[in-house]
From Swiss-Prot:
Protein name (Swiss-Prot/TrEMBL): Peptide chain release factor 2
PROSITE patterns xrefs: RF_PROK_I
PANTHER family, sorted: CLASS I PEPTIDE CHAIN RELEASE FACTOR, PEPTIDE CHAIN RELEASE FACTOR 2
Role according to the record: Peptide chain release factor 2 directs the termination of translation in response to the peptide chain termination codons UGA and UAA.
Source organism (scientific name): Pectobacterium atrosepticum (strain SCRI 1043 / ATCC BAA-672) (Erwinia carotovora subsp. atroseptica)
Gene symbol of the encoding locus: prfB
Length: 365
């Protein structure tokens, strides 16, 4: 005879946690809103306003992720309770083991939804921009910046996010001086917001003929895309707009006209730039969107000084504000805020960042 009380206790625990989550996530209101959104998307003229239709589609995906999961949990707990009763009635150990396996699946699903409670910020659900900036140190630092770009692109791909490289300035010899990546998907900013800070690399440099150990720094700065209806006042007189040719390694796709755009907000010295389109007009629009987002984040940082990771703006990065150390010679990567550490350095550089990100979110950083 198998022991059923621990399984009953697990079912009860999952049911109680589901009920708490149902209330916290306002399930009833979200279910009602989902029905409204679905009805709007079924209207034949919805695509007459493409931006609104896209916004509704995105809202539907976000609502479904919560409503459908809670529905699946409720149905799953009902099914597993019936399965346990069947196992007891027939004294069937295989069915009993199946009950435990199903509970593992439900617990994992519930855990993922509970983790969403970490995303309570106003813009946690938004798309975001990630700026990577090489520190001083020449080619070694610029190579490190390009490694970070690759790492975050791999991470985003594994999470199912879409990415766009908005701007990338090549290094003098190798690597990247700076890059801006747009990350598109549910809770992109929520996932990445604790990655803002300085990343330190220690390794034997492939650019040093003597094979000596070098320490390099590059920074990451994450800020949410701001809705157009958020009122961010920008005085045109405060802007300096420069146009230039997009950089690149050559070939038929190199832009031969001055279509790349750089915008400097003079009062704050915040700079945005875009070169990913052949149209100067489109690049300017994108750079203005980034500027609006950066100014919003800048204001939020001033209002929430205790949570401020950066000082004033990205250009004033303090190289002491390190968040993570990557010591490749010793095969050790350590988060300096949470103490989370791993020796699988290649996996991290290939985008396996969740252990660090989840720990920082749970720590309330």
């Amino acid at each position: 005879m198998f022991e059923i009380n621990p399984v009953k206790n697990r079912i009860q625990d999952l049911a109680e946690r589901s009920a708490v989550l149902r209330g916290y996530l306002d399930y009833d209101a979200k279910k009602e809103r989902l029905e409204e959104v679905n009805a709007e998307l079924e209207q034949p003229d919805v695509w007459n306003e493409p931006e609104r239709a896209q916004a509704l589609g995105k809202e539907r995906s976000s609502l479904e992720a919560i409503v459908d999961t809670i529905d699946q949990l409720a149905q799953g707990l009902e099914d597993v309770t019936g399965l346990l009763e069947l196992a007891v009635e027939e004294d069937d150990e295989d069915t009993f083991n199946e009950t435990s396996a199903e509970l593992d699946v439900l617990e994992n699903k519930l855990g993922q939804l509970e983790f969403r409670r970490m995303f309570s910020g106003e813009y946690d659900s938004a798309d975001c921009y990630l700026d990577i900036q090489a520190g001083s140190g020449g080619t070694e630092a610029q190579d490190w910046a390009s490694m970070l770009v690759r790492m975050y692109l791999r991470w985003a791909e594994a999470k199912g996010f879409k990415t766009e490289i908005i701007e990338e300035s090549d290094g003098d010899v190798a690597g990247t001086k700076s890059a801006t990546i747009k990350i598109i998907g549910d809770y992109a900013f929520g996932w990445l917001r604790t990655e803002t800070g300085v990343h330190r690399l220690v390794r034997k440099s492939p650019f040093d003929s003597g094979g000596r150990r070098h320490t390099s720094f590059s920074s990451a700065f994450v800020y949410p895309e701001v809705d157009d209806d958020i009122d961010i006042e920008i005085n045109p007189a405060d802007l300096r707009i420069d146009v230039y040719r997009a950089s690149g390694a050559g070939g038929q796709h190199v832009n031969r006209t001055e279509s790349a755009v750089r915008i400097t907000h003079l009062p704050t010295n915040i700079v945005t730039q875009c070169q990913n389109d052949r149209s100067q007009h489109k690049n300017k629009d994108q750079a203005m969107k980034q500027l609006k987002a950066k100014l919003y984040e800048f204001e939020m940082q001033k209002k929430n000084a205790e949570k401020q990771v950066m000082e004033d703006n990205k250009s004033d990065i303090g190289w002491g504000s390190q968040i993570r150390s990557y010591v490749l010679d010793d095969s050790r990567i350590k988060d300096l805020r949470t103490g989370v550490e791993t020796r699988n350095t290649q996996a991290v550089l290939d985008g396996d960042l969740d252990k660090f990100i989840e720990a920082s979110l749970k720590a309330g950083l």
